[in-house]
């Protein structure tokens, strides 16, 4: 554990911070020799960090692993050994020169494929989002339809007739509630044009007519409107005639006989 902490501190200070400041000085002074030196160092150090990622996983158990790593970083950076310049000129530069075209083609293919994969992933994401929105809309529509079906006409007709239904205006909530009859409430009022005598005459004449037809063996037929009115008028006239005929006659006084002389 102590070796790991010390090695990380050495790598950060001598491998990153000091070379970064030296590169800044080279750029500021425009010293081409120092500029080339630190460019070679950064190329070698980038490869070192890539290899270190795997070696820390697989061979970190090796004895004196962290000590070897610290010594390697110091060897790369030391102005006496110039390990970074040596590795670059002997190994890295010849290898990159041979594989440069292949590396460039791989980079171009990676750019194209990454763009295509990004577009495909975006399309798939949009399709998934659209399908999810459609499913949510259909589920919401189904729930709304079920809610509306619960308020069907059959449910409204099943309400008791005695209980009044109050209607409140949404625009004026403070207004008094309106009392209205429920939908489908049976109306018991008759037409205003029919009087009580006409309704009585219709019912009475219909009963007498049906009784007469059943006695005579004829099927009963309902009276029409005009017939009922005529019957009522005739009945009124017959009543008047009967009252006139049944008026009691006054008794004649017997004539007094004159006394005989």
Swiss-Prot record:
InterPro entries: TB2_DP1_HVA22. It is a multi-pass membrane protein. One of its GO terms (molecular function) is microtubule binding. The chain crosses the membrane at residues 1-21, 35-55. GO terms for cellular component: endoplasmic reticulum; endoplasmic reticulum membrane; microtubule. It is found in: Endoplasmic reticulum membrane. Residues 177-261 are annotated as: Disordered. Interacts with microtubules. This is Receptor expression-enhancing protein 4. It comes from Xenopus tropicalis.
